[in-house]
A protein has these predicted regions:
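Short beta->alpha connector loops at strand-helix junctions that form conserved
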Residues: 1, 52-53, 110
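Short glycine-cluster motifs
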Residues: 12-84
């Protein structure tokens, strides 16, 4: 259904007193195209609730038993996508600009643009930078391909991933050495753990 058809279905159901559950995959706040639906429901005066979901990058990290932020490695995660047939990326949100940060990248909707992802990030992260491509993460048939910027394209091609995949890029994915967080250090106090 297109947007007009989706809204028409919700409007018709609301008119006869039915409750509607508009289910999205992942978290509706990230690439869910829910804002445009909510805007139309607001105009129509139809009330709604938004229930948070689990973002694909968080589900992938859990399935991989990894943390996407590690002390002295990366303390930031950038959630982004690349432009192909969808809406253009705003100025300054291209991979070359975002990659200059060195942050862990969670790149959605871009597995068919993997060549450009690799080409843009290799000069910034290095060919040996770890990459994970997560296919249908959190579904029973989820699968992962692990590699580096140098070899991930061949591995993804061999796996046959052509859609519904998330690309994670960053040193945190490679078992990097890191120092323990200060959060649980014996000499670190805070409101929930005052000094002894």
């Amino acid at each position: 259904l297109n947007l007009d058809e989706i809204v028409a279905e919700m409007k018709a159901a609301h008119a006869v007193g039915q409750d509607v559950a508009r289910v999205h995959s992942g978290d509706p706040s990230i690439y869910g195209a829910t804002a445009e639906q909510m805007r139309r429901l607001d105009v129509l005066g139809i009330p709604y609730d938004v229930t948070p979901g689990v973002p694909a990058f968080a589900a992938a990290a859990a399935a991989l038993a990894t943390e996407l932020t590690l002390p002295d490695v990366s303390q930031s995660i950038i959630v982004t996508r690349t432009a192909m047939r969808s809406s253009a990326m705003p100025a300054g949100e291209d991979l070359t600009t975002l990659g200059k940060s060195g942050a862990t990248l969670a790149i959605h909707l871009s597995v068919n643009n993997l060549k450009n992802v690799v080409d843009e990030l290799t000069p910034l992260y290095g060919a040996d930078c770890p990459v994970v491509v997560a296919y249908r993460v959190s579904w029973p048939d989820q699968a992962f391909v692990q590699g580096t910027l140098a070899d991930i394209r061949d591995k993804v091609k061999a796996a046959g991933f052509t859609r519904t995949a998330l690309i994670l890029v960053g040193r945190v994915l490679g078992g990097a050495e890191f120092t323990d967080s200060r959060l649980y250090a014996a000499d670190h106090t805070h409101v929930l753990r005052p000094a002894k």
